[in-house]
């Protein structure tokens, strides 16, 4: 994973990246499998007292703001969140609904798990969970809201990387044809709205 992260950072430094140029590098980490169960109930991704109560999460950074990290000027494709009241020192991350793990990619402080979901109307969508210290699932694994996907960094572990990585970067995706690289290569609202839902709005509408 360290080698993958080094190649990833080197590429961003020495050429002008685009989703079209970069996505094929990430395709090998993708498994194209169909979820066995529909995602008809949605939950917060943390072990909080009530996973249906939206104010049990704390939003640290919003969807759609502009970032200078990695690629200058890219748009934040997620919300960054933590439990409002963590129940333990180590914060675990859970799947938000029935689905299947379709990608585990990147390494170190950017480790990411992506879950593919099928809605009751047959529509396919994805949830993506980034900044994971430890991952407990693998590609092709069926998950539900009780599946522990990973755990987050502690503040102390985060310091090793010189940033504040002790939070969950949560994306709600319309599609995953970029195999993950749109997370850091989205530069305008057209690209943003083509692939991503606003997670804060999605949670408000579906977690209830």
How would you label these PLM feature ranges?
Residues 16-111, 145, 158, 196-208:
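Surface-exposed, glycine-biased beta-strand/turn segments
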Residues 63, 83-85, 97, 119, ...:
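Short, flexible loop/turn elements at secondary-structure junctions
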Residues 95-136, 163-167:
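Zn2+-dependent peptidoglycan hydrolase active-site motif and core
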């Amino acid at each position: 994973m360290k080698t993958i992260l080094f190649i990833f950072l080197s590429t961003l430094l020495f050429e002008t990246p685009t989703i079209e140029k970069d996505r094929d590098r990430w395709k090998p980490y993708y498994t194209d499998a169909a979820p066995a169960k529909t995602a008809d109930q949605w939950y917060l991704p943390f072990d909080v007292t009530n996973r249906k109560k939206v104010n049990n999460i704390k939003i640290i950074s919003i969807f759609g703001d502009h970032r200078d990290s990695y690629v200058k000027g890219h748009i934040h494709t997620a919300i960054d969140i933590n439990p409002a009241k963590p129940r333990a020192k180590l914060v675990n991350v859970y799947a938000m609904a029935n689905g299947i793990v379709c990608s585990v990619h990147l390494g170190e402080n950017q480790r990411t798990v992506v879950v593919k979901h099928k809605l009751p109307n047959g529509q396919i969508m994805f949830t993506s969970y980034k900044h994971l210290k430890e991952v407990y699932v693998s590609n092709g694994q069926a998950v539900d809201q009780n599946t522990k996907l990973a755990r987050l960094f502690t503040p102390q572990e985060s310091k090793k990387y010189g940033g504040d990585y002790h939070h969950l970067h949560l994306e709600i995706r319309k599609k995953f044809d970029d195999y993950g690289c749109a997370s850091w290569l989205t530069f305008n609202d057209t690209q943003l709205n083509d692939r991503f839902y606003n997670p804060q709005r999605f949670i408000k509408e579906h977690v209830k």
